[in-house]
């Protein structure tokens, strides 16, 4: 069984992405790493992602293709379990993993699930054209979600903006806000097209989400590839103290309840959904 990992980055040093650490992780896990987007245009459209991701998937030679964001790793302790999981579900189009979202090295939230572990050997017609932004994988037009593919407790470790400065975040958020406006005709919850306005909207979202970051761990618990970088976060980087937010936020009982509900109860409820085993549905995919 051969595993390919597809990722993308553009000017990763300028954008302060943990790209060196991420690629080291990918090369340790996969037989092949395909890197896209090195010449991706500054002012992009969301529709630009579809052909890029499709090209990455189609050019991959692995039996399984894992689509990874460059700020996301898989823990080395899960490598063998992941490989065994791929063998177990070899007849399914994808596998869904949990997403551990980090803003600081010491707390995380189980934000969502992602169906980005894709079975190319048996489902070569997978395309990246689904979801709200048109970048999620589909099979025969069916959006791959956590409800229609097998689910694993293995996690994607997502570091989001941990290593970025306020200036880098502001410019990134403004670029994405402009792309959002070009696609949907409004800015939604992204604020506006200037760095200042986009950052303000983003930071309000961060404050809301950080309230649910109630699960704690030590730096040594992280994937080994990223530990040294986490130990050397500078004061002007978001992950140092969230630009002051870390010291000012006061969590309520509701915040803890919501965090535990999303991590445990929602998974418990989801465990009863076995629709992915429906052979008729699987044949349609």
Predicted regions located by residue number:
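Residue-level detector of structured alpha->beta connecting loops
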Residues: 30-31, 61, 90
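Hydrophobic targeting segments
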Residues: 2-7, 26, 32-35
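Catalytic-site signature of metal-activated, phosphate-bearing donor transferases
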Residues: 49, 54, 77-285
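Generic beta-sheet signal
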Residues: 3, 65, 93-97
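N-terminal cationic-hydrophobic initiation segments that often serve targeting/anchoring roles
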Residues: 26-27, 57, 86-87
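Active-site-proximal specificity loops/subdomain of glycosyltransferases
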Residues: 7-21, 34-67, 77-78
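The conserved acidic donor/metal-binding loop of glycosyltransferases
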Residues: 69-73
């Amino acid at each position: 069984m051969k595993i390919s990992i597809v990722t993308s980055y553009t000017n990763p040093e300028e954008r302060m992405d943990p790209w060196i650490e991420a690629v080291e992780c990918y090369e340790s896990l996969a037989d092949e790493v395909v890197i896209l987007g090195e010449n991706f245009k500054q002012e992009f459209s969301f529709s630009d992602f579809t052909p890029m991701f499709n090209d990455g998937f189609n050019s991959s030679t692995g039996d399984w293709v894992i689509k990874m964001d460059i700020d996301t790793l898989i823990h080395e302790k899960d490598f063998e379990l992941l490989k065994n999981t791929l063998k177990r579900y070899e007849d399914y189009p994808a596998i869904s993993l949990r997403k551990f979202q980090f803003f600081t090295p010491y707390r995380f939230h189980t934000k969502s699930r992602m169906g980005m572990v894709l079975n190319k050997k048996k489902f070569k017609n997978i395309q990246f054209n689904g979801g709200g932004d048109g970048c999620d994988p589909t099979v025969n037009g069916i959006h791959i979600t956590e409800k229609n593919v097998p689910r694993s407790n293995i996690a994607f470790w997502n570091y989001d903006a941990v290593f970025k400065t306020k200036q880098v975040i502001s410019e990134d958020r403004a670029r994405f806000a402009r792309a959002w406006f070009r696609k949907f005709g409004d800015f939604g919850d992204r604020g506006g097209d200037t760095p200042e306005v986009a950052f303000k909207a983003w930071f309000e979202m961060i404050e809301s989400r950080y309230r649910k970051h109630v699960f704690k761990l030590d730096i040594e618990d992280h994937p080994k590839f990223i530990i040294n970088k986490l130990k050397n976060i500078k004061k002007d980087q978001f992950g140092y103290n969230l630009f002051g937010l870390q010291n000012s936020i006061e969590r309520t009982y509701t915040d803890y309840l919501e965090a535990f509900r999303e991590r445990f109860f929602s998974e418990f409820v989801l465990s009863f959904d076995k629709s992915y085993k429906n052979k008729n549905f699987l044949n349609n995919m």
